Amino acid sequence: MDRKTFLRTTVAGAAALVAAPGALVSCASPKEKKQPSVPLRLSFQEGVTPGETLAEKLDFMEKLGIVGFEPGGKGLAGRVQEIREALQGRDIQVSAICAGFDGFILAEDPAVKAQFDTSMREIVRAAGELGSTGVIMVPVFNWQNPALPHTLETRDYLCQQMHDLGEFALSCGTTVILEPLNRKEAFYLRLVGDAAAICRDAGSAGVKCMGDFWHMQEETSDYAAFMAAGPYLQHVHIASRGNRVMPGEDGDKDCYTDGFRALKELGYPNYVSFECGCRSDDRAATLTAAVDLLRKQWDEA
């Protein structure tokens, strides 16, 4: 293997080559690039928000100044009109779409892969109709078998598949967003920098990646993860650091300023979306406190 190929396919090479020049400077002197004017755009997944109906959920979000709504992808094509009408006249937009497809992209079984191709494209079309920033996808979970082996050939295959999917997403006015997971959930894609390298090598502006504060804490620092993503960063998930509940419910563990500082330095334009449970019986009060905590830490970052 020559040096160029080695750098292209290693974690170190991915992190080094993905970062834009400005990002590399920021990593060397992280306090010099603060951009406090960058707004914190918070989003809630549909299941996070209290309320019996979609209208009630959105009413609650509006009261807190939440500007993003992240629905699931399952059945999304049949909900486009419902969601459009519910958002009409509100200062809330659809952020990302949380998966919801059948099958998986790295399936060995052609029938399972075909399920992914069909269902994912249906969700991507609906995402485009809703003006979503993209559809989140994981290449393969630990429990999904049989899957293609973790080899250079599989990586090349994934890059080609992502290119095709990214181009389709662009034609629909949206993107596809690779999500790295922690090692307990995924063997294949675990670092934000690795996901960004695949975005780069896929060669399509429709292929992006995301970072999740819950998953990132096991793999690298929040700051380094986001800076490695650079211009490919399209979405962010957030939860408490100990038990994946609401930010603040795990006390002093729930510090996000390191990651927020990176998002500011990057001029990150998209959403930080709640993907978490709730320990408290009073979900509304806990969400309100969580939003206050994140806004405070954003100002401090």
Locate each region found by the language model.
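Structural motif corresponding to the early beta-alpha repeats
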Residues: 67, 71-166, 244-246, 256, ...
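Surface-exposed charge patches
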Residues: 59, 84-85, 125, 167, ...
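Residues that cap or flank secondary-structure elements
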Residues: 48-50, 74-75, 115, 157, ...
